[in-house]
């Protein structure tokens, strides 16, 4: 961990787990934000919105995200080895706009795969003063764990107004929207994505108390999910058996019934309570995985349990239903026990795309500290083969999982080199990242040759072609 960074404290981290956001004010001079604002206006007037290429066009934006305050906050919520994703966008809110409805963003390069555990985050940056009337972003704090609009709207709207340079980091699945612009000025908000490269093993914030205590600040949301919050807090601490303090005297049959309750809040609370209870409810939870309505909550329960349940889940990877196999593969990734590795490697050959996708992602979430070099080489080799899958969202997960393996992904250098020419831009990005993290002279040469060939020069325009 970079000790020089101003890290989040326990209270800030707990607030992020509950609320799903943290607001920052890096101390850059106003002139920097004014310069970025002018260059955004110039981009839009001359070239339109260049989307992902806004960063090489306006490299000062990188300076904003390199601020120690921002890096410290991202380190807290995403771990030391977080990475900036290659998707970014300038959201342009024009005068007179009516705003948006609340929504969750899709995952770039992947199918929708919401995570309660913070593996992805977004950052919103304002280069201009952004009062309410200019149409800032609004969020529903605490809504990141809810899938239905009805449940999300039980939470109160918070307007993210702010001075030039304001940055808000949010959990990727937080419900948010652009508000109506009632002013005569343009409002720009730059959205950048980040994701973690390593599951937590130790706290990456300034941790002093490992016990979960509800935050003391005034609640601005209307739900209370202390068992879920404690589970997520324990995961961020790197605790592999986070539920040792749960009261096991719950009526499990009643909890199972509540997985189909009308209230999403009740379904969620029951799922995490069942996960905390663990072993004795696992067979019943596995039986529920085939249900489209209840299965997602059973998956949450299984994934938030403890490694002692892994053998039962491994057996269920042979279930006749591909939906069950996919959900089991996902839960095994959340549990993170390396005894599941060989079985997840076999699941890469499943005929069902969603099983292959979940197995591919889960392989990137399981620690390599087991030290079985033969198994690590097999993992890298098989993930390299999946880079040829017909579905881009499986290839994207394969490249990202190889990037998470770091130097251990060296056996996949050849397929990663081919993936630099993939038809999907995000597969290309993750393949390049994987080569960077492999770090051998061969991987570095391949990467630099690719980057020099594909380099986009921000100084070259139709007015100045050479």
Residue ranges and their predicted role:
Residues 268, 272, 283, 295-300, ...:
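Alpha-solenoid HEAT/ARM repeat scaffold
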């Amino acid at each position: 961990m970079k000790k020089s960074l101003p890290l989040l404290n326990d209270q800030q981290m707990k607030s992020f787990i509950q609320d799903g956001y943290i607001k920052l004010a890096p101390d850059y001079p106003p002139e920097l934000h004014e310069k970025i604002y002018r260059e955004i206006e110039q981009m839009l007037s001359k070239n339109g919105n260049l989307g992902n290429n806004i960063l090489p066009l306006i490299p000062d934006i990188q300076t904003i995200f390199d601020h120690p305050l921002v890096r410290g906050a991202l380190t807290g919520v995403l771990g030391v080895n977080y990475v900036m994703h290659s998707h970014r966008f300038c959201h342009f809110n024009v005068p007179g706009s009516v705003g948006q409805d609340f929504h969750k963003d899709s995952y770039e390069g992947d199918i929708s795969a919401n995570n309660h555990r913070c593996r992805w985050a977004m950052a919103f940056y304002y280069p201009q003063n952004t009062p309410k009337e200019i149409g800032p972003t609004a969020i529903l704090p605490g809504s990141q764990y809810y899938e239905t609009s009805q449940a999300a709207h039980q939470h109160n709207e918070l307007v993210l107004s702010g001075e030039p340079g304001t940055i808000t980091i949010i959990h990727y699945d937080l419900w948010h929207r652009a508000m109506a612009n009632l002013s005569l000025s343009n409002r720009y908000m730059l959205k950048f994505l980040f994701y973690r490269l390593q599951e937590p093993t130790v706290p990456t914030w300034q941790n002093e108390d490992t016990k979960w205590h509800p935050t003391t600040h005034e609640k601005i949301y209307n739900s209370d999910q202390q068992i879920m919050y404690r589970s997520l807090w324990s995961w961020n601490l790197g605790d592999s058996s986070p539920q040792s303090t749960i009261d096991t005297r719950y009526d499990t049959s009643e909890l199972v019934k509540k997985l189909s309750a009308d209230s999403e809040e009740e379904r969620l609370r029951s799922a995490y309570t069942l996960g905390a209870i663990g072993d004795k409810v696992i067979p019943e939870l596995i039986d529920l995985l085939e249900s489209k309505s209840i299965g997602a909550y059973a998956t949450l329960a299984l994934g938030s349990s403890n490694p002692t349940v892994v053998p039962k889940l491994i057996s269920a990877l042979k279930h006749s239903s591909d939906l069950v196999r996919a959900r089991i593969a996902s839960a095994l990734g959340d549990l993170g026990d390396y005894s599941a590795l060989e079985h997840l490697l076999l699941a890469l050959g499943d005929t069902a795309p969603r099983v292959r996708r979940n197995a591919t992602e889960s392989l990137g979430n399981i620690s390599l500290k087991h030290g079985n070099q033969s198994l690590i080489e097999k993992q890298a080799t098989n993930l390299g083969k999946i880079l040829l899958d017909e579905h881009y969202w499986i290839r994207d997960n394969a490249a990202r999982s190889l990037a998470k393996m770091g130097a251990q992904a060296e056996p996949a250098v050849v397929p990663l080199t081919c993936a630099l020419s993939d038809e999907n831009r995000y597969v290309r990005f993750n393949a390049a990242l994987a080569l960077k993290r492999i770090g051998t002279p061969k991987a570095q040469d391949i990467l630099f040759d690719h980057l020099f060939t594909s380099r986009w020069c921000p100084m070259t325009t139709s007015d100045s072609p050479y």
